[in-house]
Amino acid sequence: MPRPRKRFAQHWLKSQAVLRQIIAAAKIQGCDRILEIGPGRGVLTRELLAQAQSVVSVELDRDLCKSLRHTFNDQENFTLLELDFLNLDVAAELTEPLPNKVVANIPYNITSPILSKLLGRIDAPAQPVYETVVLLIQKEVADRLVAEPGSKIFNGLSVRSQYLADCELICPVPASAFKPAPKVESAVVRLTPRPYPQPVQNPQWLSTLLKVGFSSRRKMLRNNLKSLVDRDQLSECLNTLNISLQARAEDLSVTQWIALSDSVHPSQV
């Protein structure tokens, strides 16, 4: 069996308890078609194949692909794609019916682009591709996905993710659950993508506001956004929305960000 490679951020999940938590969180039924990112040695893959209609696993490591083909050679409901998931064109490379759920222990070093590919982007609205996304990720990222407004860890990722999906923390996962043990703690999260359109007039404008608004966390929102919106007009909008003039970006909820975006859009002010 190939050894884990640092350049691929590979850590093999060895905890059966965590494996059961992942499977339970996905609520897999016999009709489900699963997309798995980074199957590694196939520990999770085996459980998915036992419960789902089909599993498509995407793996970049050539040696692991060779091992996976040997292990699951007799599984008719298993498809292995040897490529970088970030380069996968689901519609072009997979046949109908396409996967409806994602269940994966993903490489932590590319978590952000994976989330963008799975959930989409605020500035590029699209109908959700997947019903459910269950991921084993770094706990620091998981905590931000489910963070509450006003907390120190609530940031742009929190707003974007919660705008695009219902985010749930399923369970923490200690480093000892892996071999080799990573230097960080992990967690299982379940993301349920929200159908578009969300109630915002201009998604591109909201995306810009978030990027600029969270650019300097110590500054008040009025100062961060002054390059986009006249300070007096912004103050008036904040007052109308019952948002403190001293508010910082992390103090606003997703709903408040949507309301602010609509209020200060150039067509409205």
UniProtKB/Swiss-Prot annotation:
Keywords (A to Z) from UniProt: Cytoplasm, Methyltransferase, RNA-binding, rRNA processing, S-adenosyl-L-methionine, Transferase
Binding site for S-adenosyl-L-methionine: H11, L13, G38, E59, D84, N105
GO cellular component, one term: cytosol
Localization: Cytoplasm
NCBIfam families found in the cross-reference section: ksgA (TIGR00755)
Matching PROSITE patterns: RRNA_A_DIMETH, SAM_RNA_A_N6_MT
GO molecular function: 16S rRNA (adenine(1518)-N(6)/adenine(1519)-N(6))-dimethyltransferase activity; RNA binding
Top-level enzyme category: transferase
Primary site of residence: cytoplasm
Family statement: Belongs to the class I-like SAM-binding methyltransferase superfamily. rRNA adenine N(6)-methyltransferase family. RsmA subfamily.
Known function: Specifically dimethylates two adjacent adenosines (A1518 and A1519) in the loop of a conserved hairpin near the 3'-end of 16S rRNA in the 30S particle. May play a critical role in biogenesis of 30S subunits.
Reaction(s) catalysed by this chain's protein: adenosine(1518)/adenosine(1519) in 16S rRNA + 4 S-adenosyl-L-methionine = N(6)-dimethyladenosine(1518)/N(6)-dimethyladenosine(1519) in 16S rRNA + 4 S-adenosyl-L-homocysteine + 4 H(+)
EC number from the UniProt entry: 2.1.1.182
Protein name, UniProt field: Ribosomal RNA small subunit methyltransferase A
